[in-house]
Amino acid sequence: MAEATYTPKLRTFYDEVVRPKMIEQFGYKNPMEVPTIDKIVINMGVGEATADTKKVTTAAADLAQIAGQKPVITRARKAISNFKLRENQPVGAKVTLRKARMYEFMDRLVSIALPRVRDFRGLNPKSFDGRGNYAMGVKEHIVFPEINYDRVEQIWGMDIIVCTTAKTDEEARALLKAFNFPFRQ
């Protein structure tokens, strides 16, 4: 007897709605040519880590709750005396999400977290890098539903990078719009 495998809601949405729409819009000959979302990288830089390294551990724990997987502690590559930073000192945490976790995170980001951001007027449509990847910043990590607001010691910001297989920014923008990313007009 074969076990039933779990498929995220956005993955089936991509297969049934987004892919045919993209083929129609851009005239792809091969369905494998249609851009997909490759990975999502979430990075938390902790500036106060130079004074107290416990803050990196706290930020990493919050990031693990948000992403659903254990983050990697990022370390300083070289010493910078003006920032009181030594080489190999912990300065933040990052997580790379792929496959099911990526789609689940993207669903929570678009439907729950972004609407909870204060004074949110839409994502900047100019934040593409020229190669089909999109980067955005979130000033407060408490917009995610996994974070218990009462237990938060400090509010951290984070960078979220959505890497796609799109060749151009126009294709990537159409892909993310199809996934209901709220871009500014």
Swiss-Prot record:
Pfam families listed in its UniProt record: Ribosomal_L5, Ribosomal_L5_C
GO biological-process terms attached to the record: translation
Tree of life domain: Bacteria
Entry keywords, A to Z: Ribonucleoprotein, Ribosomal protein, RNA-binding, rRNA-binding, tRNA-binding
Disulfide-bond pairs as recorded: none
Gene3D superfamilies: 3.30.1440.10
InterPro entries assigned: Ribosomal_uL5 (IPR002132), Ribosomal_uL5_bac-type (IPR020930), Ribosomal_uL5_C (IPR031309), Ribosomal_uL5_CS (IPR020929), Ribosomal_uL5_dom_sf (IPR022803), Ribosomal_uL5_N (IPR031310)
One Gene Ontology term of the molecular function aspect: tRNA binding
Presence of keyword tRNA-binding: yes
GO cellular component, one term: ribonucleoprotein complex
Chain's role: This is one of the proteins that bind and probably mediate the attachment of the 5S RNA into the large ribosomal subunit, where it forms part of the central protuberance. In the 70S ribosome it contacts protein S13 of the 30S subunit (bridge B1b), connecting the 2 subunits; this bridge is implicated in subunit movement. Contacts the P site tRNA; the 5S rRNA and some of its associated proteins might help stabilize positioning of ribosome-bound tRNAs.
Protein family: Belongs to the universal ribosomal protein uL5 family.
Quaternary organization: Part of the 50S ribosomal subunit; part of the 5S rRNA/L5/L18/L25 subcomplex. Contacts the 5S rRNA and the P site tRNA. Forms a bridge to the 30S subunit in the 70S ribosome.
The protein, known as: Large ribosomal subunit protein uL5
Species in which this protein is naturally found: Xanthobacter autotrophicus (strain ATCC BAA-1158 / Py2)
Lineage of origin: Bacteria, Pseudomonadati, Pseudomonadota, Alphaproteobacteria, Hyphomicrobiales
